[in-house]
């Protein structure tokens, strides 16, 4: 487990405004993995801000920010999946020690990244993302099964309505036509 050294909206003496993310103490070179699938954007702020930073634009429109990296392991525009290596922890930018700055934006506004703390804590555990992936597959199967049940019900209703239609209809002209067609085909050969 990574020690949390600064929390969301925490006001430290060296900050001019509340913290917009969560800082996790990490050694330089610790692998950093994306916690969700998305599109990569890179920034290098030099000795300011979050230094080398990876932005992962998630499929739900939110953006995860991984800052103070020592090195990138991805390229601009690349697509990553949950669990993919995106870089290595470092001490770049305005930093008081080696750590990962993690934050989340919705549009242009930072939101509380606390719901994703567990994902960061387990980002280097391959079985964690395999479990998350299998949960999604089960959910998709449940969704598919639910809709197949609905389609089956609608087909049953259609069948009942068709039988009801035939029972109420005078279909003797149809039978007479079929008899004539069969006689023509089989007896006029």
Regions flagged by a language model, labelled:
Residues 5, 25, 57, 67-70, ...:
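Residue-level detector of conserved, well-ordered beta-strand and adjacent loop positions
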Residues 29-30, 74-76, 90-93:
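Gly/Ser-rich catalytic serine loop of serine hydrolases
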Residues 17-20, 34-76, 98-99, 103-106:
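Zn2+-dependent peptidoglycan hydrolase active-site motif and core
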Residues 24, 53-56, 81-95, 102:
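Short hydrophobic beta/alpha edge segments that flank linear recognition/processing sites
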């Amino acid at each position: 487990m990574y020690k949390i050294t600064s929390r969301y909206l925490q006001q430290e003496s060296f900050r001019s405004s509340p913290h917009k993310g969560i800082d996790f103490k990490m050694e330089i070179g610790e692998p950093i993995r994306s916690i969700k699938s998305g599109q990569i954007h890179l920034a290098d702020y030099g000795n300011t801000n979050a230094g080398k930073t990876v932005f992962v634009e998630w499929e739900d429109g939110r953006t995860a920010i991984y800052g103070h990296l020592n090195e990138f392991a991805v390229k601009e525009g690349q697509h990553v999946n949950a669990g993919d290596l995106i870089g290595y922890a470092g001490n770049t930018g305005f930093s008081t020690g080696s750590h990962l700055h993690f934050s989340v934006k919705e549009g242009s506004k930072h939101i509380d990244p606390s719901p994703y703390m567990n994902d960061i804590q387990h980002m280097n555990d391959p079985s964690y993302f395999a479990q998350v992936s299998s949960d999604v597959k089960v959910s998709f199967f449940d969704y598919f099964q639910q809709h197949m049940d609905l389609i089956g019900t609608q087909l049953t209703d259609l069948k009942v309505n068709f039988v009801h239609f035939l029972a109420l209809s005078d279909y003797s002209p149809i039978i007479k036509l079929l008899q004539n067609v069969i006689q023509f085909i089989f007896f006029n050969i």
